[in-house]
Amino acid sequence: MSDMKAIKNRKILKVKTDGTPAETVDDAIAVESQLSVVLNGTSYVTLLCTPEKLEDLVVGYLLSEGIIDKPGQLSRIQITRTHRCEVDVTPEPDLQKRIEAVDSRNPAVFKGNRRMLSPSAESGSDLAPLMASSDVTFPLSALQRAIDTLNRDASIYRKTGGVHATCIASKDGETVCLAEDVGRYNTVDKEIGGCARRGSSFQDKFLATTGRIT
């Protein structure tokens, strides 16, 4: 398990606009770390992330990418102190095919990393729209309750102002889980992975996030 912290304290020079002298003060800084994901011995992707809830992040990423359908396909997931996540997946995915598919769309991208795809792919303009298959509705009060929770409980953001936050909530707005990260995509993956690992159903839940949806 990584022993990195999500926040570091650094001395900064605080420059004021009221004409008073600048001063050196302690400030809380959000940490960004690299996490190299190795699938069945193959280096697949390096994620830039806040170093907490890393297992949830990796599981959510694999689910979002369609590499796995459920957490039960993972026979091992281990975060090392060298910022690697070693994952054993069954059945073994065709990683080379995925890497070649990404390379063919944009040779400059980092292999396997959807967060560095071309602008058209990033915006979703090349994807067919998905139609809702559920008739579940949520009252406005539930949405407001979830947003209030984000504003209140996003502790890293409140200390640093440098991260996004996402929560998954039930029909009445009660938060099931909450995640923070320097990357807005990562917060969603952490939520998906965390809920999936706990066996929570997504059928009657909604997601609230501080990041823009694109």
Model-derived segments and their meaning:
Residues 214:
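Acidic, divalent-metal-coordinating active-site segment for phosphoryl/phosphodiester hydrolysis
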Residues 156-211:
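Glycine- and Gly-Pro-enriched alpha-helical subdomains that act as flexible
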Residues 2-172, 176-178:
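Intrinsically disordered, low-complexity regions enriched in acidic/Ser/Thr/Pro/Gln residues
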